[in-house]
């Protein structure tokens, strides 16, 4: 299997399977002398860790990360950083019945069609368990951003879960870390929990919309045409398990607007920097950052592993009824939030490194004489 790496100069390769002995990431291209510790990476992993509340999978993994290389005396050396997370709470017996059967909505059938072999235990490589490695590597990216571009803040949150949607009039950044759903609407939390638990009792699952914002991204990051910042951001988010659609800025809603409504007007601020009247562009124009918030959102499909009987086929082509056992998230969007933050950090850091390598400092100074 190839295509397990992401990035240009800051490059992350993940490895491992859901029920294997361990999984992890190799981070190549991290600048030297960046503060990196297991404790710091653990902080981000704990946001994603399973088994912490009744709204996520009950698989109870500590997700304890070990740094095997690339860090000396608390600082990156500039060489590859190897991260490892042991799997300790596998329950592979739950998957014995699907060894010969393809689960509807899963990658079981496509992996078999492509490779002729698959690890059916928990989905193997296609499991969302793989994203733990991304979150650990994302911690490295965040620390590098602190050194190279202090002031950048990355925050993800859910805006929708099935029929439930946040009220943006009540949007509160401080509420995001205070509830199990990572939503910026504290008044909606109980309704969301009641809705999800009702679905769980029905042996069903639900999809979600996750939004990620990067504040403080300097103008000029990205490149035209094939090197667009939004191209890599879209690819990063689409690579997350179960993601089926990505929007940047106004996204699909831009098709409903007139040009006079969608174009963000520009003024000169009192500090001599451009000020925009709105941010329909999501902080990116022509593939290059404007200096506004970079805003991206994506849709996550409902978890396919449910106890409701579904029709499928076996490897020999005969019909089968599938009831997926095991411990699964009723809404995978909840734990996708820290994964999305990690992917945003990867891309922003990667493009800052690319920008410095090609341009150095921004060349166009607005307000300067010709």
Swiss-Prot record:
Which top-level enzyme class is recorded in the Swiss-Prot or TrEMBL entry? lyase
Question: What is the superkingdom listed in this entry's lineage?
Answer: Bacteria
Catalytic activity as recorded in UniProt: 5-O-(1-carboxyvinyl)-3-phosphoshikimate = chorismate + phosphate
| Record note on quaternary structure | Homotetramer.
Needed co-factor(s): FMNH2
Q: Does the keyword Lyase apply?
A: yes
By what name is this protein known? Chorismate synthase
Q: Where is NADP(+) annotated to bind?
A: 48
Q: Which CDD domains match?
A: Chorismate_synthase (cd07304)
Q: Which cellular components does GO assign to this protein?
A: cytosol
What gene codes for this chain? Answer: aroC
Q: Name one GO molecular function term.
A: chorismate synthase activity
Matching InterPro entries: Chorismate_synth (IPR000453), Chorismate_synth_AroC_sf (IPR035904), Chorismate_synthase_CS (IPR020541)
Concerning Gene3D superfamilies, the annotation shows: Chorismate synthase AroC
């Amino acid at each position: 299997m190839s295509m397990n790496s992401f990035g240009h100069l800051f490059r992350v390769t993940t490895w491992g399977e859901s029920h294997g002995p361990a999984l992890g990431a190799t981070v190549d291209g991290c600048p030297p002398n960046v503060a990196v510790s297991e404790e710091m990476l653990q902080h981000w992993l704990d946001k994603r860790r399973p088994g912490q509340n009744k709204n996520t999978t009950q698989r109870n993994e500590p997700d304890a990360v070990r740094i095997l290389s690339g860090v000396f005396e608390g600082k990156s050396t500039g060489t590859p950083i190897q991260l490892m997370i042991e799997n300790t709470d596998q329950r592979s017996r739950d998957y014995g019945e699907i060894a010969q059967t393809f689960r509807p909505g899963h990658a079981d059938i496509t992996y078999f069609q492509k490779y002729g072999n698959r690890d059916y235990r928990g989905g193997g490589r296609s499991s969302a368990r793989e994203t733990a490695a991304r979150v650990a590597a994302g911690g490295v990216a965040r620390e590098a951003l602190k050194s190279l571009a202090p002031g950048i803040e990355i925050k993800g949150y859910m805006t929708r879960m099935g029929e439930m949607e946040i009220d943006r009039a009540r949007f509160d950044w401080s509420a995001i870390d205070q509830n199990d759903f990572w939503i910026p609407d504290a008044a909606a939390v109980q309704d969301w929990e009641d809705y999800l638990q009702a679905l769980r009792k029905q042996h069903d699952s639900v999809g979600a919309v996750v939004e990620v914002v990067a504040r403080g991204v300097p103008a000029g990051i990205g490149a035209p045409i094939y090197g667009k910042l939004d191209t890599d951001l879209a690819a990063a988010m689409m690579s997350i398990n179960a993601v089926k659609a990505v929007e940047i800025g106004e996204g699909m809603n831009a098709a409903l607007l007139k040009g006079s409504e969608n174009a963000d007007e520009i003024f000169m601020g009192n500090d001599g920097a451009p000020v925009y009247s709105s941010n329909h562009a999501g902080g990116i124009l022509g593939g290059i950052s404007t200096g506004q918030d970079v805003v991206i959102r994506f849709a996550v499909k409902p978890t396919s592993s449910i106890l409701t009987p579904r029709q499928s086929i076996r490897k020999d082509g005969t019909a089968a009824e599938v009831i997926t056992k095991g411990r699964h998230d009723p809404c995978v969007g909840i734990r996708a939030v820290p994964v999305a933050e990690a992917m945003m950090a990867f891309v922003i850091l990667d493009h800052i490194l690319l920008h410095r390598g090609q341009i150095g400092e921004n060349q166009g100074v607005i307000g300067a004489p010709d």
